[in-house]
Amino acid sequence: MTQFRSDFLRLLETRGYIHQITDAKSLDEKASQSVIAAYIGFDPTAASLHVGSLLQIMMLRRLQQAGHKPIVLMGGGTGKIGDPSFKDEARKLLDEDTIKANIASIKRVFEHFLHFGDGENDAVMVDNAEWLDRLEYIPFLRDVGQHFSVNRMLSFDSVKLRLDREQSLSFLEFNYMILQAYDFLELSRRFGVCLQLGGSDQWGNIVNGIELARRMDGKEVFGLTSPLMTTADGVKMGKTVGGAVWLNGDMCSPYDYWQFWRNTHDADVERFLKLFTDLPLDEIARLAALEGSEINEAKKILANEATKLAHGEKAAEEAAATAKKTFEEGAAGDALPVMKVSDSSISLVDALVGLGLVASKAEARRMIRGGGARINGEKALDEKAVIEVTAENIRISAGKKAHGVIQAG
């Protein structure tokens, strides 16, 4: 493990946020000597961010906890194009009113994680439409475009992936990389930003911005990426059988959010406690050492702490109480129906019918479409959802009062 001097990089390193840094020694020295400003960009493609963006939000939180200034960059300009990075096809283009509404909704998420204001290390939210919408095409090509090599841009993994699959990459999307690099330059001029944070899939875009700032302004700026977030099962973070796990409470209830974290794989508990909670490392080590059924206590603490950050302490307490009443007390007090499954998986529709929770497959599908079906407390909205049967009991619910258990057998 690298021995960093700055509180910021030590914090990121010990909790597992660092994948790559462009010049770790120089960045560490700068962060140890003065307050730095760093940013992450988020495209407002929906009315909320989902759990897949939470690692980046937590990196900004760690930045502020270490005494530095977080800049939340909303892609009101780039969002009109869409980031092609590692996407199989072009994104649907959004109109300006939708983008503005999405940004207003997303800001509510950040207010739970960051302190906004006018202080030296208070967070600021800015929209890149402020400068991108005003760009003049010919001057931009002349002043900025000359610093980019098409040959090099074609070598980026995010572009090669599309081209290797013989999938179209529009000129519109190709320009995204130049605009994102220009964001870094503009933020360094406006706010003195010297660091861009992002996921590992953004490495090429970040390096573009670093080189542009050096060539146009002679500035030394840095990039730092986090690891690709997947679960122990190899699944991309943030998706469940019920769809995306949104961070806004009106799109994913605090209870459903709590259940998402409660259902964490045993092998992910320690890592998620470090990344997604503020618990001290010694407490996390104690929880990670729990074995057998005791690991469930660590999962409940993870769920409580993660929900507290996203929705507040009261919402977390209510979600935990609801889960206990619905899940634990119900299981202990009721003679729940049990279905033994010899195969490695079973469809949710078959499980609902087999447990006698609904009368027919048609009713099961209606139950799922209406949002009344749950797997281990998580809402399941996909009629084709398949449940992987493991050694642990799997609780299936139809509505608030009808529950059953699937067991391997």
From Swiss-Prot:
Recorded family membership: Belongs to the class-I aminoacyl-tRNA synthetase family. TyrS type 1 subfamily.
E.C. no: 6.1.1.1
Record protein name field: Tyrosine--tRNA ligase
Location relative to the cell: Cytoplasm
Primary role: Catalyzes the attachment of tyrosine to tRNA(Tyr) in a two-step reaction: tyrosine is first activated by ATP to form Tyr-AMP and then transferred to the acceptor end of tRNA(Tyr).
Residues the record lists as binding ATP: 239
Domain annotation S4 RNA-binding: ranges: 346-408
Record key words, sorted: Aminoacyl-tRNA synthetase, ATP-binding, Cytoplasm, Ligase, Nucleotide-binding, Protein biosynthesis, RNA-binding
Positions that bind L-tyrosine: 39, 176, 180
Cited Gene3D superfamilies: HUPs (3.40.50.620), RNA-binding S4 domain (3.10.290.10), Tyrosyl-Transfer RNA Synthetase (1.10.240.10)
Quaternary structure and interacting proteins, as annotated: Homodimer.
Gene source species: Zymomonas mobilis subsp. mobilis (strain ATCC 31821 / ZM4 / CP4)
UniProt motif 'KMSKS' region: location: 236-240
Main location (coarse class): cytoplasm
Domain of life: Bacteria
GO biological process, one term: tyrosyl-tRNA aminoacylation
Catalytic activity: tRNA(Tyr) + L-tyrosine + ATP = L-tyrosyl-tRNA(Tyr) + AMP + diphosphate + H(+)
Gene Ontology cellular component terms for the protein in this record: cytosol
GO molecular function: ATP binding; RNA binding; tyrosine-tRNA ligase activity
Top EC class, one word: ligase
Motif 'HIGH' region per UniProt: ranges: 44-53
